[in-house]
């Protein structure tokens, strides 16, 4: 027989940003426990609301199946001595099984005959073990900071108030986290029944919705919020900004979602939209509304947790709450514009970037020089890049950014425009932080790209230079910064070398007395290795296999755009028919050369070529070396590898017909030199011997 099983944990308000993660982990953990206990079922569905976590298991077996457990003993040859008496090993094994050696069965395998003990183990009722399984599942939740409550010694993410466990209509007796199982379920704080009893698991979650006015189904609440918010925005001729992270958070904050539309005074639209949106989304969890051409409307959509008979009062209340915050933004904006950005530059002397690396003014000076250097390399306007670098951090000293920290950069852009700075300079103040996350937009022009790379490289080199390279944690977000630099270079195809960039960045940490702020002598090598290491994760995310990435990394190309061309070329080569054989041949050549402790010749001695196969290969290698020079010079690695694939037949013939390690030293050295020349052709692109089948 199988029944529906329900477990609901009633708690105090759970952290909204963690609710989905907790619920999904609870379901995954419990399903794993059921599997380990060999309890059959048809599925586990999770439910989550601000004050509850619940699971419902469909068709859960009421009883574990009986099973035969086999315990193999020693081999018969080792279980008895020459006289046929049981050895100590056999006796000890039998004792552990609770039998005598004579009672053991025999098992014959292809490796011999063994003693065997078979025991029938009766399955336990699910009701007897499910409490322990649920407790283990909860104990495995990803809770960074568990808490205690009352006089209890148990810990959980929030205090637990109720516990309900039902198998069909039967109450499962037990205690988890210090709370005994009961049929009592809590409803909404302000609507429906505060508490009520549930008779069977099948009633959940419908009874909670009907009597308790709580939608326990997380995905249902989210779908309602999305659909109703889109309708509400359309009703006022707009489009709601339904960013998924915010939708998730709001879904986790409400038990009974009611979507409402409110407004604010149009005069606030004179303030940059980003500041208003920051207030609405960050502080109040409201959804901004835009026109089709991305202009902010004087409206916002919010989700109430109650179904009011007078929704206008709820709307007015939210409008009243947001108005002072918008007024603050307006005040800061007007006040900040009374001073130019450049006038705030000296104030950066009072802000520490990092104790050993100096002030933000020091960092600004370095960014200015490095941005100019990079701009020159990529053909961007040098003076505009330097100007943008000089102004890059000035908005950190404004009231707006001090109050609304996430507006850094974008407010700098608006203030720069107000001050009459060139548009490229203004854009760079915002785009210096791009890309902010994986998949984010890149800086839109060369000036912005130069400043963005300069800012990131200064941070990376500086932090590595004082010996604080990221290990587990990454407080300065150096991994993200490194990937940002690489993305900008690769996606714009800039001919930049990390060696040059890192060396230039390092040089700018020199102080007036000739010493450097940096104390790590290996900073250049460590930074380059760190940044190249970011390629591994990036290209794996792009779908390239690890061995392709490793094949390129083995050559340590330090020009990111060049690295990208190599990866794509090797990926294309791997699909060719000749790839597997040539990869194996390169591996074989590498192994042969590694064992040779002599000195290779400077060039092949044609007079020493004896076998037809080695003559053909030598000719092909010579022709290929000359033919591939243009492809190598221009970085056309795909064309080069496609041509190198033609060497498969002469390479195969060489290994089939030529004794490489000949007794004659001159012959051996000449053949090894030929193989080395062959391998070097491939190594100009990647170490294809690392490619897997």
From Swiss-Prot:
Keywords from the UniProt entry: Aminoacyl-tRNA synthetase, ATP-binding, Cytoplasm, Ligase, Nucleotide-binding, Protein biosynthesis
Cellular localisation: Cytoplasm
Enzyme Commission number(s) from the entry: 6.1.1.14
Catalytic reactions on record: tRNA(Gly) + glycine + ATP = glycyl-tRNA(Gly) + AMP + diphosphate
InterPro entries per UniProt: DALR_anticod-bd, Gly-tRNA-synth_bsu, Gly-tRNA-synth_heterodimer
UniProt keyword Nucleotide-binding present: yes
GO cellular component labels: cytosol
GO biological process: arginyl-tRNA aminoacylation; glycyl-tRNA aminoacylation
One family name in Pfam for this protein: DALR_1
GO molecular function (one): ATP binding
SUPFAM superfamilies with a match to the protein in the record: HD-domain/PDEase-like
Subunit-level organization: Tetramer of two alpha and two beta subunits.
Similarity comment: Belongs to the class-II aminoacyl-tRNA synthetase family.
Protein name, UniProt field: Glycine--tRNA ligase beta subunit
Species for this entry: Vibrio vulnificus (strain YJ016)
């Amino acid at each position: 027989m199988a029944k529906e099983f329900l477990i609901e944990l009633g708690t105090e308000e759970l952290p909204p940003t963690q609710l989905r993660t907790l619920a999904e982990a609870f379901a995954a953990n419990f399903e794993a426990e059921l599997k380990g206990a060999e309890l059959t079922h048809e599925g586990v569905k999770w439910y989550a609301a601000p004050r509850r976590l619940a699971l419902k298991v469909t068709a859960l077996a009421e009883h574990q199946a009986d099973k035969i457990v086999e315990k193999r003993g020693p081999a018969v040859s080792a279980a008895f001595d020459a006289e046929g008496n049981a050895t100590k090993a056999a006796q000890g094994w039998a004792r552990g099984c609770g039998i005598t050696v004579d009672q053991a069965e025999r098992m014959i395998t292809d490796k011999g005959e063994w003693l065997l003990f078979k025991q029938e183990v009766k399955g336990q009722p699910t009701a007897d073990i499910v409490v322990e399984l649920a407790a283990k599942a909860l104990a495995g939740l990803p809770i960074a900071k568990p808490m205690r409550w009352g006089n209890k010694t148990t810990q959980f993410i929030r205090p637990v108030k109720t516990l309900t466990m039902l198998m069909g209509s039967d109450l499962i007796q037990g205690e988890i986290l210090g709370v005994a199982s009961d049929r009592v379920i809590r409803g909404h704080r302000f609507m429906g029944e505060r508490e009520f009893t549930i008779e069977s698991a099948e009633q959940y979650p419908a009874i909670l919705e009907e009597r308790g006015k709580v939608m326990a189904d997380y995905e249902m609440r989210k779908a309602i919020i999305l659909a109703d918010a889109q309708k509400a925005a359309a009703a006022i001729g707009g489009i709601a900004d339904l960013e998924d992270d915010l939708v998730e958070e709001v879904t986790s904050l409400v038990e009974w979602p009611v979507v409402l539309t409110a407004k604010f005074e149009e005069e606030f639209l004179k303030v940059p939209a980003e500041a208003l949106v920051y207030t609405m989304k960050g502080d109040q969890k409201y959804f901004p509304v835009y026109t089709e051409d991305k202009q902010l409307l004087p409206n916002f959509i919010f989700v109430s947790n109650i179904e009011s008979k007078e929704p206008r009062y709820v709307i007015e209340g939210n409008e009243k709450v947001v108005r002072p915050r918008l007024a603050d933004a307006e005040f800061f904006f007007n006040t900040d514009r009374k001073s130019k950005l450049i006038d705030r530059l000296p104030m950066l002397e009072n802000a520490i970037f990092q104790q050993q690396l100096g002030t933000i003014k020091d960092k600004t000076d370095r960014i200015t020089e490095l941005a100019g250097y990079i701009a020159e390399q990529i053909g961007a306007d040098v003076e505009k890049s330097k100007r943008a670098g000089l102004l890059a951090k000035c908005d950190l000293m404004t009231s707006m950014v001090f109050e609304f920290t996430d507006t850094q950069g974008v407010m700098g852009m608006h203030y720069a425009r107000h001050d009459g700075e060139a548009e490229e300079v203004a854009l760079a103040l915002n785009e210096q932080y791009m890309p902010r996350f994986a998949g984010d937009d890149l800086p839109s022009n060369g000036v912005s790209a130069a400043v963005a790379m300069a800012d990131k490289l200064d941070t990376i080199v500086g932090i590595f230079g004082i010996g604080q390279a990221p290990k587990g944690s990454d407080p300065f977000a150096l991994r993200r910064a490194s990937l940002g630099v690489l993305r900008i270079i690769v996606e714009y195809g800039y001919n930049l070398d990390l060696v040059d960039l890192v060396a230039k960045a390092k040089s700018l940490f020199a102080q007036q007395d000739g010493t450097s702020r940096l104390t790590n002598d290996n900073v250049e090598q460590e930074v380059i290795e760190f940044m190249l290491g970011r390629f591994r994760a990036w290209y794996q995310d792009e779908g390239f296999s690890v061995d392709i990435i490793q094949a390129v990394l083995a050559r340590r190309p330090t020009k990111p755009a060049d690295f990208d061309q190599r990866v794509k070329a090797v990926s294309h080569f791997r699909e060719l028919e000749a790839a597997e054989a040539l990869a194996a041949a390169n591996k074989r050549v590498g192994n042969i050369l590694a064992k040779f402790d002599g000195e290779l010749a400077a060039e092949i001695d044609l007079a020493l070529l004896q076998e037809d196969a080695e003559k053909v290969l030598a000719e092909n290698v010579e022709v290929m070396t000359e033919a591939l020079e243009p492809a190598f010079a221009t970085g056309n690695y795909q064309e080069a590898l496609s041509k190198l694939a033609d060497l498969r037949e002469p390479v195969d013939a060489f290994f089939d017909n030529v004794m490489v390690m000949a007794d004659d030293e001159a012959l051996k050295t000449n053949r090894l030199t030929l193989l080395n020349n062959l391998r070097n052709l491939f190594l100009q692109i990647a170490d294809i011997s690392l490619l897997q089948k």
